[in-house]
Amino acid sequence: ECKYLWGTCEKDEHCCEHLGCNKKHGWCGWDGTFG
């Protein structure tokens, strides 16, 4: 189960596709890959 946008995370693998973990804030955000 992956975390959606703004979901809490500790690393990128916790987030859904096209999302990456913002380690400074501890939530998932867009990682810049849309293709």
Swiss-Prot record:
This is U1-theraphotoxin-Hhn1a. It comes from the Eukaryota. Keywords: Disulfide bond, Ion channel impairing toxin, Knottin, Secreted, Toxin. The lineage of its organism: Eukaryota, Metazoa, Ecdysozoa, Arthropoda, Chelicerata. It holds the Pfam family Toxin_12. Signal peptide: none annotated. The keyword Ion transport does not apply. Disulfide bonds join C2-C16, C9-C21, C15-C28. The keyword Disulfide bond applies. Its main location: secreted.
